[in-house]
C-alpha cells in the first residue's frame, strides 16, 4: 500500500515538473518586450479593453497579440 502511495506521489511530482518545463519553454520561445504582461485579460463584457479590469501596478490595457502574447481577441495589461 505504501509503495503505491509513493509511486503516485512520484508521478504527480514528475507531471508538475513537466508542465512547468513546458510553460518555461513557451516563454523562452515567445519573448516579450520589457514592460509587457503576458495574457492578463482586461476585456469587459462588451468586448472593450478596459484599464479598470487590470491589476494594480499596470498603467495600460490594450489588444496587441504581438506585444502582450494574449490569444486573439483578448486584451492585456501592461506595466
From Swiss-Prot:
Show which residues constitute the signal peptide.
1-21
Q: Under the GO molecular function aspect, what terms does this record hold?
A: toxin activity
* UniProt entry tagged with the keyword Lyase: no
User: Which function does this protein serve?
Assistant: Induces neurotoxic symptoms on zebrafish. Has also been claimed to be implied in calcification, but tests on homolog proteins suggest that proteins of this family have a neurotoxic function and not a calcification function.
Q: What highest taxon heads this organism's lineage? A: Eukaryota
Keyword annotations of the record: Cleavage on pair of basic residues, Disulfide bond, Nematocyst, Neurotoxin, Secreted, Signal, Toxin
Keyword Ubl conjugation in the entry? The reply is no
Location in the cell reads:
Secreted; Nematocyst
Q: Which organism is the protein's source?
A: Orbicella faveolata
Give the similarity note. Belongs to the Cnidaria small cysteine-rich protein (SCRiP) family. beta subfamily.
Report residue numbers covered by any propeptide: 22-36
Cellular-component GO terms for this entry:
extracellular region; nematocyst
Q: What is its main location?
A: secreted
Post-translational modification as stated in the protein's UniProt record: Contains 4 disulfide bonds.
What protein name is recorded for this chain?
Small cysteine-rich protein 1
